[in-house]
């Protein structure tokens, strides 16, 4: 039997007892995202009704009918919350601490910037950048300063997970090419994510930008068995890739473009082969893989690690494998 569920309560701080204390921070304003006009074509999440239609008959069970589950955009946002439960369960069993889950603005309208209320009892902060760019969420100077101070504490890890940026051009023909490349009817011709995380990266001096929404290559003869990553394991002193061969299949993953030269201080640990049979400006430029996992080791006053990887790899909406669970285990048990 699963534990009883709670909602809309104040966070109870977790004592430091050796295990890593993990927190998830959803960067969205839940009310703003949930109340986007479904008549708008671009830059919104799908409604649950649209999800049910596209994924039929996956959600044609009583738990997802109108008497049990929200049918608008809010229902889709709740799918994201549900999709991290497997990760939370594993993290809790490994660390001995429950995963704390925060939202920038939650369902009840409470706003929570990243400050000491979150950071004081957090060792690994996972920033899931699923706010739309046009929502104009920005990291305040006080948040950047608080995170900088927190990263001076030994054993901290900031995981940044900016999501895809599909259709950022005004060229409608290119938008259509991108759409046909990823092939997901639930992603519109323009869907730009992660304004908050971008502003946070700028403030922290992280030389990375999330761009595109790329369909990963799959194992020949399959439709959604993702191809193995190209891991640079000799650079992976954290051991994030131990017993990890693949990430999660998701038809529109971001490329983490470096805006500074790769170096010991800016390490690309894994690149994902991209699907070459579907044209895309990224592959037409000669690229065959995209950056999927980046590590910025401690440097100067920063004693903590910074890791970049897409939030999709911590959800079960698009499946999950033993390799993925190994990644989770490695992250929550990394040196502290």
Segments and roles (model prediction):
Residues 1-336:
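Short, surface-exposed patches at the edges or C-terminal ends of soluble domains, predominantly
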């Amino acid at each position: 039997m699963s534990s009883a569920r709670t909602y809309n309560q104040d966070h109870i701080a977790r004592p430091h007892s050796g295990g890593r204390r993990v927190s998830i921070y959803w960067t969205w304003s839940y009310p703003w995202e949930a109340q986007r006009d479904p008549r708008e074509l671009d830059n919104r999440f799908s409604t649950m009704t649209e999800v049910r239609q596209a994924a039929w008959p996956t959600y044609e069970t009583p738990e997802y009918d109108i008497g049990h589950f929200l049918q608008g955009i809010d229902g889709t946002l709740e799918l994201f919350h549900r999709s991290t439960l497997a990760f939370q369960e594993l993290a809790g069993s490994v660390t001995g601490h429950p995963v704390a889950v925060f939202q920038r603005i939650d369902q009840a309208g409470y706003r929570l910037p990243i400050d000491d209320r979150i950071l004081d009892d957090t060792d690994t902060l996972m920033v899931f950048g699923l706010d739309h760019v046009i929502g104009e969420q920005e990291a305040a100077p006080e948040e950047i300063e608080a995170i900088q101070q927190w990263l001076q504490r030994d054993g901290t890890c900031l995981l940044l997970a900016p999501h895809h940026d599909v259709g950022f051009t005004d060229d409608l023909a290119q938008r259509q090419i991108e759409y046909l490349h990823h092939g997901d009817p639930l992603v519109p011709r323009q869907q730009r994510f992660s304004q908050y995380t971008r502003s946070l990266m700028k403030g922290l001096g992280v030389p990375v930008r999330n761009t595109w929404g790329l369909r990963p290559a799959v194992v020949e003869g399959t439709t959604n068995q993702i191809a193995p990553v190209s891991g640079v394991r000799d650079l992976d002193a954290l051991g994030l890739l131990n017993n990890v061969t693949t990430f999660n299949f998701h038809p529109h993953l971001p490329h983490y473009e470096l805006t500074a030269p790769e170096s010991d201080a800016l390490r690309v640990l894994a690149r994902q082969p991209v699907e070459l049979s579907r044209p895309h400006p990224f592959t037409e430029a000669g690229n065959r893989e995209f950056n999927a996992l980046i590590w910025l080791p401690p440097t100067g006053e920063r004693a903590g690690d910074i890791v970049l990887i897409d939030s999709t790899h911590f959800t079960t909406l698009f499946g999950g494998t033993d390799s993925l669970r190994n990644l989770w285990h490695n992250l929550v048990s990394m040196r502290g």
